[in-house]
Protein backbone atom coordinates (compact mmCIF):
# COMPACT_ATOMS: atom_id res chain seq x y z
CA UNK A 1 0.00 0.00 0.00
CA UNK A 2 1.28 3.43 -0.95
CA UNK A 3 1.21 6.26 1.60
CA UNK A 4 1.58 9.82 0.31
CA UNK A 5 3.45 12.37 2.40
CA UNK A 6 2.35 15.71 1.00
CA UNK A 7 4.33 18.85 1.86
CA UNK A 8 1.62 21.53 1.88
CA UNK A 9 3.76 24.16 3.62
CA UNK A 10 3.37 26.61 0.72
CA UNK A 11 -0.42 26.35 0.67
CA UNK A 12 -0.92 29.83 2.16
CA UNK A 13 1.27 31.45 -0.48
CA UNK A 14 -0.65 30.92 -3.70
CA UNK A 15 -0.42 34.05 -5.81
CA UNK A 16 -3.61 36.03 -6.50
CA UNK A 17 -5.66 34.34 -9.21
CA UNK A 18 -4.57 30.82 -8.22
CA UNK A 19 -5.93 28.35 -5.68
CA UNK A 20 -4.15 25.69 -3.66
CA UNK A 21 -5.68 22.23 -4.06
CA UNK A 22 -4.85 20.03 -1.03
CA UNK A 23 -3.81 16.51 -1.98
CA UNK A 24 -6.40 15.09 0.42
CA UNK A 25 -9.22 16.85 -1.44
CA UNK A 26 -8.54 15.16 -4.78
CA UNK A 27 -10.35 11.89 -3.99
CA UNK A 28 -11.50 9.70 -1.12
CA UNK A 29 -8.56 7.41 -1.79
CA UNK A 30 -6.11 10.33 -1.57
CA UNK A 31 -7.77 11.49 1.65
CA UNK A 32 -7.26 8.07 3.26
CA UNK A 33 -3.65 7.51 2.23
CA UNK A 34 -2.17 11.01 2.62
CA UNK A 35 -0.20 12.53 5.47
CA UNK A 36 -0.45 16.27 4.82
CA UNK A 37 2.19 18.46 6.45
CA UNK A 38 1.56 22.15 7.14
CA UNK A 39 3.34 24.96 8.98
CA UNK A 40 3.06 28.74 9.28
CA UNK A 41 6.85 29.06 9.14
CA UNK A 42 7.33 30.15 5.52
CA UNK A 43 4.27 32.34 5.29
CA UNK A 44 4.74 34.14 8.59
CA UNK A 45 8.56 33.88 8.94
CA UNK A 46 8.29 31.65 12.01
CA UNK A 47 10.92 29.07 11.06
CA UNK A 48 12.70 29.42 14.40
CA UNK A 49 9.62 28.22 16.25
CA UNK A 50 8.33 24.66 16.22
CA UNK A 51 4.86 25.02 14.74
CA UNK A 52 4.48 22.30 12.13
CA UNK A 53 1.41 20.10 12.16
CA UNK A 54 -0.11 17.28 10.17
CA UNK A 55 -3.59 16.38 9.00
CA UNK A 56 -4.25 12.65 8.70
CA UNK A 57 -7.81 11.39 8.20
CA UNK A 58 -6.99 7.68 8.29
CA UNK A 59 -7.12 6.77 12.00
CA UNK A 60 -4.71 3.82 11.72
CA UNK A 61 -2.16 5.92 9.84
CA UNK A 62 -2.60 8.81 12.28
CA UNK A 63 -2.03 6.51 15.27
CA UNK A 64 1.22 5.23 13.72
CA UNK A 65 2.50 8.75 13.06
CA UNK A 66 1.53 9.98 16.53
CA UNK A 67 3.22 7.00 18.19
CA UNK A 68 6.44 7.51 16.22
CA UNK A 69 6.48 11.26 16.87
CA UNK A 70 5.84 10.79 20.61
CA UNK A 71 9.13 8.91 20.99
CA UNK A 72 11.09 12.14 20.61
CA UNK A 73 10.43 15.58 22.06
CA UNK A 74 12.44 17.22 19.29
CA UNK A 75 9.35 18.48 17.45
CA UNK A 76 7.13 19.13 20.43
CA UNK A 77 5.63 22.62 20.37
CA UNK A 78 6.22 25.02 23.25
CA UNK A 79 3.99 27.77 24.65
CA UNK A 80 5.49 30.44 22.40
CA UNK A 81 5.14 28.39 19.22
CA UNK A 82 1.51 27.50 20.00
CA UNK A 83 0.60 31.17 20.51
CA UNK A 84 2.50 32.15 17.34
CA UNK A 85 0.59 29.51 15.34
CA UNK A 86 -2.76 30.68 16.71
CA UNK A 87 -1.86 34.33 16.11
CA UNK A 88 -0.76 33.66 12.54
CA UNK A 89 -4.09 32.08 11.64
CA UNK A 90 -6.25 34.82 13.13
CA UNK A 91 -8.05 37.32 10.82
CA UNK A 92 -5.21 39.84 11.19
CA UNK A 93 -2.79 37.19 9.96
CA UNK A 94 -4.90 36.49 6.90
CA UNK A 95 -5.06 40.20 6.12
CA UNK A 96 -1.27 40.34 6.29
CA UNK A 97 -0.99 37.27 4.01
CA UNK A 98 -3.31 38.86 1.44
CA UNK A 99 -1.06 41.92 1.32
CA UNK A 100 2.06 39.72 1.17
CA UNK A 101 0.61 37.75 -1.75
CA UNK A 102 0.11 40.98 -3.71
CA UNK A 103 3.75 41.96 -3.14
CA UNK A 104 4.94 38.50 -4.17
CA UNK A 105 2.78 38.62 -7.31
CA UNK A 106 4.20 42.01 -8.23
CA UNK A 107 7.74 40.69 -7.73
CA UNK A 108 7.04 37.48 -9.68
CA UNK A 109 5.43 39.36 -12.58
CA UNK A 110 8.32 41.82 -12.73
CA UNK A 111 10.96 39.06 -12.60
CA UNK A 112 9.21 36.87 -15.17
CA UNK A 113 8.74 39.68 -17.68
CA UNK A 114 12.25 41.04 -17.14
CA UNK A 115 13.84 37.64 -17.74
CA UNK A 116 11.85 37.03 -20.93
CA UNK A 117 12.75 40.47 -22.24
CA UNK A 118 16.41 40.76 -21.19
CA UNK A 119 17.96 37.34 -20.46
CA UNK A 120 18.01 35.54 -23.81
CA UNK A 121 18.52 31.81 -23.34
CA UNK A 122 17.12 31.71 -19.79
CA UNK A 123 13.86 29.79 -19.50
CA UNK A 124 11.34 29.74 -16.68
CA UNK A 125 7.73 29.06 -15.84
CA UNK A 126 5.52 31.73 -14.36
CA UNK A 127 4.98 30.82 -10.70
CA UNK A 128 1.53 30.20 -9.24
CA UNK A 129 2.65 30.41 -5.64
CA UNK A 130 5.40 30.94 -3.07
CA UNK A 131 8.35 33.26 -3.55
CA UNK A 132 10.85 31.03 -5.35
CA UNK A 133 11.68 31.28 -9.02
CA UNK A 134 13.62 28.64 -10.94
CA UNK A 135 15.73 29.84 -13.84
CA UNK A 136 16.71 27.21 -16.41
CA UNK A 137 20.07 28.50 -17.63
CA UNK A 138 21.15 25.55 -19.80
CA UNK A 139 20.71 27.31 -23.14
CA UNK A 140 22.33 30.51 -21.83
CA UNK A 141 25.35 28.60 -20.44
CA UNK A 142 25.87 26.74 -23.71
CA UNK A 143 25.57 29.91 -25.80
CA UNK A 144 28.13 31.66 -23.57
CA UNK A 145 30.42 28.63 -23.24
CA UNK A 146 30.24 28.68 -19.45
CA UNK A 147 29.07 26.41 -16.66
CA UNK A 148 26.53 26.89 -13.91
CA UNK A 149 29.19 27.31 -11.21
CA UNK A 150 30.72 30.27 -13.04
CA UNK A 151 27.27 31.80 -13.52
CA UNK A 152 26.39 31.34 -9.85
CA UNK A 153 29.67 32.98 -8.76
CA UNK A 154 29.09 35.91 -11.13
CA UNK A 155 25.78 36.68 -9.43
CA UNK A 156 27.22 36.43 -5.93
CA UNK A 157 30.11 38.70 -6.95
CA UNK A 158 27.63 41.52 -7.64
CA UNK A 159 25.55 40.93 -4.51
CA UNK A 160 22.83 38.69 -5.93
CA UNK A 161 22.62 35.81 -3.48
CA UNK A 162 20.91 33.04 -5.39
CA UNK A 163 20.93 29.29 -4.93
CA UNK A 164 22.26 26.41 -6.96
CA UNK A 165 19.33 24.46 -8.40
CA UNK A 166 21.20 21.18 -8.84
CA UNK A 167 20.12 19.75 -5.46
CA UNK A 168 16.57 20.00 -6.85
CA UNK A 169 17.53 17.76 -9.80
CA UNK A 170 17.84 20.60 -12.29
CA UNK A 171 21.42 20.62 -13.61
CA UNK A 172 21.42 24.16 -15.01
CA UNK A 173 18.95 25.75 -12.63
CA UNK A 174 19.25 28.73 -10.36
CA UNK A 175 16.79 29.17 -7.51
CA UNK A 176 15.94 32.80 -6.87
CA UNK A 177 14.12 34.11 -3.78
CA UNK A 178 11.67 36.96 -4.49
CA UNK A 179 10.53 37.54 -0.89
CA UNK A 180 11.92 41.04 -0.55
CA UNK A 181 10.82 44.62 -1.16
CA UNK A 182 10.08 45.37 -4.81
CA UNK A 183 12.78 48.05 -5.00
CA UNK A 184 15.41 45.41 -4.13
CA UNK A 185 14.03 43.01 -6.75
CA UNK A 186 14.48 45.76 -9.35
CA UNK A 187 18.02 46.46 -8.16
CA UNK A 188 18.94 42.76 -8.25
CA UNK A 189 17.65 42.39 -11.81
CA UNK A 190 19.47 45.53 -12.88
CA UNK A 191 22.72 44.03 -11.54
CA UNK A 192 22.05 40.66 -13.16
CA UNK A 193 21.39 42.42 -16.46
CA UNK A 194 24.47 44.67 -16.45
CA UNK A 195 27.03 42.42 -14.81
CA UNK A 196 25.94 38.81 -15.29
CA UNK A 197 23.65 37.88 -18.17
CA UNK A 198 24.48 40.77 -20.50
CA UNK A 199 27.92 41.80 -19.24
CA UNK A 200 30.05 43.44 -21.89
PLM regions with names:
Residues 6, 101, 108, 189:
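Short amphipathic alpha-helical/adjacent loop interface patches that line ligand
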Residues 27-105, 112-113, 117:
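Conserved core segment of the aminotransferase class I/II
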Residues 1-3, 33-35, 161:
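Proline-centered loop/turn at the N-terminus of a beta-strand
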Residues 82, 86, 102-112, 124-138, ...:
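Conserved glycine-rich beta-strand-loop-beta hairpin in the small C-terminal domain of fold type I
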Residues 57-58, 90, 136-138, 179-181:
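Residue-level recognition of strand-loop junctions within catalytic nucleotide-signaling folds
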Amino acid sequence: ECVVISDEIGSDLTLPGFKHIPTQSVSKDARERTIALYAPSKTFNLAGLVGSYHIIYNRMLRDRVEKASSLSHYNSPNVLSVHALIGAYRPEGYQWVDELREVLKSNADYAYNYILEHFKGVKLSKPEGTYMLYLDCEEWCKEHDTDIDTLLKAGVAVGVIWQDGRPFHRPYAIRLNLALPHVLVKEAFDRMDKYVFNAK
